[in-house]
Amino acid sequence: MSKNTVALDVDYVKSQFPAFKDPKSSKWSFFENAGGSYVPINVIDHLNHFMTSTKVQPYAEFDTSAIAGDNMDQATALFAEMINAKTDEIIIGGSTTMNMYVLSNAMRSLLKPGDEVIVTNQDHEANVGAWRRLAEHGMVIKEWQINANTAELEIDDLKSLLSNKTKIVAVTHCSNIVGSINDLKAIAKLVHEYDAYIVGDGVSYAPHGFPDVKD
């Protein structure tokens, strides 16, 4: 074991999750974090405190509201720190599906009929359906397909799809379908050469990989 490797104390980690004390779930391992996960006791305690103490309209002129606002600001700052972003670059929403739908509608004003949007068949529906709906407004949707033998997205296949009409490329950072981790930095570099936007779905990667959005 190298000096930079830290052993994971699995027993300690599991002890932080009340679900593993329940006979119905104690012998299971849960990997579908994107679809919903059990949470550790400290998260449960924070949620309980929110529901019983600070579930009010934030940023108003009374003490509980001020505390609620401070808690929201702190949460935003922590998310920003995790991915090396500025706090004004962070928006907390209800779900990735909803956030992508809002984003696609917001970006629609930047597009015109005939502009091209590239999606993949490796992505979760959240980062596909919202962009496919732009076809209703005259945008051309292209699909970057996986290699049928490896289930990987090949960068050369993306090159063949990109054109001077490409405006958006939507791609997952880590596929929860096949487990691939895509080289988002290399993909972004290529997409930016066409003066296009890249939209990365980090749901399956960010909780484990701590991406640096400034890198």
Model-derived regions, located:
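Pyridoxal 5′-phosphate
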Residues: M1-D215
